[in-house]
């Protein structure tokens, strides 16, 4: 039951709305609506009850009515006694009776009501019952909510606890309330005692629960995940959250979806941090040099896929040059990794290691190229410049076991003969370069030979170059020697077996008496001069430069092992010009 409303008459004769707080012997204590006046005691004769609900009569001219109005702006509206003077449609002209001077006002029907039929209150209009409260229930009775059911059962409009007298005060307008209150008092106090006992137990249990929760949740982690990564953090059907909750020592995981904030509670710090690794998804950018992007990705994306698989990141993307979201550094391409913080850290370690490896390899290759360039420069400065183009030189630098003229193998003849001192050392670090040690011509010498991908590979000669070079020499084997060799169909003959040249050139030529016919093709551009009583000596230095010297027959025995004694050979056809005295021919030019 709500508070009991009454109407209190003021000094001006108007009735103001108020509420009963307590009942005394000859007065009641009331509080006014909106607290426009302080709480005070009002005598019974100045108090009346409001009219019954639904009480309303037809209002006619000359009827006494009550008008809901106010005397000034400081006071609330109240009910004033008045009389209807005229009715025009919905408007009523009324005259106030409480005023000394006649005062008329035009009002509507909403502000009018019939005169309140209730008389002023008396001592018997209100009933008050006091019940002593046991000592153990005093604290319980101080709560108004504890008497809600009892108040409804006895029909009282107010049940309150008097802390000064330790009494339960019951107020009512019905006399039957006194009887019901006395009848239900023992039962009410017993139920209060039971409720109090249960409430104390629940309160103690709540305290223990709160204490346990605080103890269990003394470790707390809080972090925010980007809104576009919340789906990855939660996982399919909340799989990641369930996995984090299964971590031993984690007591609770809360998610604030509005702020995308995770709260993790646990018994120890390690459990909380481990659960965080399952839920904290982020995005990180790693800058990769543009010239290494292809090597980082690998063929068909094999290398970058290996990094993704081993690190555990969800995905990686390579930003386009025109992407405005990420401003790449100059000469760098951004690789964007998406995943947990732990997986991104692993991906960063793998990628940094691979980038350092690629940079070291490039540095080693650059150093090797610089060394090779210096070696080529040293080799070029240590030998005289050639008088003929490289294509006219007398040996192949690219294929040591190449064929002679007529595409036949050298078969250990001439310059292709390999002695016991021959050694070869090929470096495979770079296929463009090979280092070969040749036998003595006349002494051992090391050469750097550039591969087919280099510029020096243009120095290799073709079969036609061999053919032209043979025509530069005016020496040929004797007729007896030609019988020992296989005769070619084109009339060309292979040189003697004991010459130092690769094709039988440069052998010792004796002073033969009988001329022999020579049907070989001669090169009219270059002719070799010789004396009538001299011999030709061919020398090849370390730079592959050939020189022809004429010597007398007496000096032939001095050469020893260097020049072999040839058999009787038919003297070549005498040349038109005979040079008097020794003449030196270098590279076929006198």
Swiss-Prot record:
GO biological process, one term: DNA repair
Biased composition (Gly residues): 497-509
Residue ranges of the region described as RNA-binding RGG-box: 494-507
Function: Multifunctional polyribosome-associated RNA-binding protein that plays a central role in neuronal development and synaptic plasticity through the regulation of alternative mRNA splicing, mRNA stability, mRNA dendritic transport and postsynaptic local protein synthesis of target mRNAs. Acts as an mRNA regulator by mediating formation of some phase-separated membraneless compartment: undergoes liquid-liquid phase separation upon binding to target mRNAs, leading to assemble mRNAs into cytoplasmic ribonucleoprotein granules that concentrate mRNAs with associated regulatory factors.
Keyword terms of this UniProt record: Cell membrane, Cell projection, Centromere, Chromosome, Cytoplasm, Membrane, mRNA processing, mRNA splicing, mRNA transport, Neurogenesis, Nucleus, Postsynaptic cell membrane, Repeat, Repressor, Ribonucleoprotein, RNA-binding, Synapse, Synaptosome, Translation regulation, Transport
Span of domain Agenet-like: 4-50, 63-115
Encoding gene, per UniProt annotation: fmr1
Notes on the domains: The C-terminal disordered region undergoes liquid-liquid phase separation (LLPS) for the formation of a membraneless compartment that concentrates mRNAs with associated regulatory factors.
Family statement drawn from the similarity comment of this UniProt entry: Belongs to the FMR1 family.
Protein name per UniProt: Fragile X messenger ribonucleoprotein 1 homolog
Domain annotation KH: ranges: 222-251, 285-314
SMART domains: KH
Tissue expression: Expressed ubiquitously throughout the embryo. Shows tissue-specific expression in adults, being abundant in most neurons of the central nervous system (CNS) and in all spermatogenic cells of the testis.
Region: Disordered, residue numbers: 376-438, 453-590
Subunit structure and binding partners: Homodimer. Heterodimer.
Subcellular localization(s) per the UniProt record: Nucleus; Nucleus, Nucleolus; Chromosome, Centromere; Chromosome
Entry-linked Pfam families: Agenet, FXMR_C2, FXMRP1_C_core, KH_1, KH_9, Tudor_FRX1
GO function term, MF aspect, one: chromatin binding
Native source organism of the sequence: Xenopus tropicalis
Entry GO terms, CC: axon; axon terminus; cell projection; chromocenter; chromosome; chromosome, centromeric region; cytoplasm; cytoplasmic ribonucleoprotein granule
Biased composition regions of type Basic and acidic residues, renumbered to the chain: 427-437, 510-531, 561-578
């Amino acid at each position: 039951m709500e508070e009991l409303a009454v109407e209190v008459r003021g000094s001006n004769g108007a009735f103001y709305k108020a509420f009963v707080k307590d009942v005394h012997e000859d007065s009641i204590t009331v509080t006014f609506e909106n607290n426009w006046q302080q709480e005070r005691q009002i005598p019974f004769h100045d108090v009346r009850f409001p009219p019954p609900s639904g009480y309303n009569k037809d209002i006619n001219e000359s009827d006494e009515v009550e008008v809901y109005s106010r005397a000034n702006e400081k006071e609330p509206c109240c009910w004033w006694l008045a009389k209807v003077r005229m009715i025009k449609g919905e408007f009523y002209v009324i005259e106030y009776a409480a005023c000394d001077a006649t005062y008329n006002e035009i009002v509507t029907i909403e502000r009018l009501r019939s005169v309140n039929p209730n008389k002023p209150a008396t001592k018997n209009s209100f009933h008050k019952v006091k019940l002593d409260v046991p000592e153990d229930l005093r604290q319980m009775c101080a709560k108004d909510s504890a008497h809600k059911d009892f108040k409804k059962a006895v029909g009282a409009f107010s049940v309150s606890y008097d802390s000064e007298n330790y009494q339960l005060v019951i107020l009512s307008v019905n006399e039957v309330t006194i009887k019901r209150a006395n009848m239900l008092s023992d039962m009410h106090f017993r139920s209060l005692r039971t409720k109090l006992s249960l409430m104390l137990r629940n309160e103690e249990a709540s305290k223990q629960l709160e204490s346990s929760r605080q103890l269990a949740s003394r470790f707390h982690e809080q972090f925010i995940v980007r809104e576009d990564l919340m789906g990855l953090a939660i996982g399919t059907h909340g799989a990641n959250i369930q996995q984090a909750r299964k971590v031993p020592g984690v007591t609770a995981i809360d998610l604030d979806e509005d702020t995308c904030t995770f709260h993790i509670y646990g018994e120890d710090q390690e459990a909380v941090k481990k659960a965080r690794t399952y839920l904290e998804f982020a995005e990180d950018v790693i800058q990769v040099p543009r010239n290494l992007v292809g090597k980082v990705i690998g063929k068909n994306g094999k290398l970058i896929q290996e990094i993704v698989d081993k690190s555990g990141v969800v995905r990686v993307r390579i930003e386009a040059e025109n992407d405005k979201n990420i401003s790449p550094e100059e000469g760098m391409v951004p690789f964007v990794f998406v995943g947990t913080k732990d997986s991104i850290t692993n991906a960063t370690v793998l990628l940094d290691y691979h980038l350092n490896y690629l940079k070291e390899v490039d540095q080693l290759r650059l150093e090797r190229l610089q060394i090779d360039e210096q070696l080529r420069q040293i080799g070029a400065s240590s030998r005289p410049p050639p008088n003929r183009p490289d294509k006219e030189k007398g040996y192949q630098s690219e294929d040591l076991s190449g064929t002679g003229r007529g595409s036949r193998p050298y078969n250990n003849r001439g310059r292709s003969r390999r002695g016991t001192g021959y050694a070869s050392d090929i470096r495979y670090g770079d296929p463009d370069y090979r280092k070969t040690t040749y036998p003595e011509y006349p002494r051992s010498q090391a050469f750097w030979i550039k591969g087919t991908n280099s510029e020096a590979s243009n120095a290799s000669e073709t079969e036609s170059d061999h053919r032209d070079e043979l025509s530069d020499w005016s020496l040929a084997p004797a007729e007896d020697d030609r019988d020992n060799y296989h005769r070619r169909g084109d009339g060309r003959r292979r040189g003697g077996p004991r010459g130092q040249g690769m094709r039988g050139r440069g052998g010792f030529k004796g002073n033969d008496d009988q001329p022999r016919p020579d049907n070989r093709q001669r090169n009219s551009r270059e002719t070799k001069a010789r004396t009538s009583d001299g011999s030709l000596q061919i020398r090849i230095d370390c730079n592959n430069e050939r020189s022809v010297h004429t010597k007398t027959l007496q000096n032939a025995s001095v050469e020893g092992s260097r020049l072999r004694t040839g058999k009787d050979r038919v003297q070549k056809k005498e040349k038109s010009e005979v040079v008097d005295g020794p003449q030196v021919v270098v590279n076929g030019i006198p």
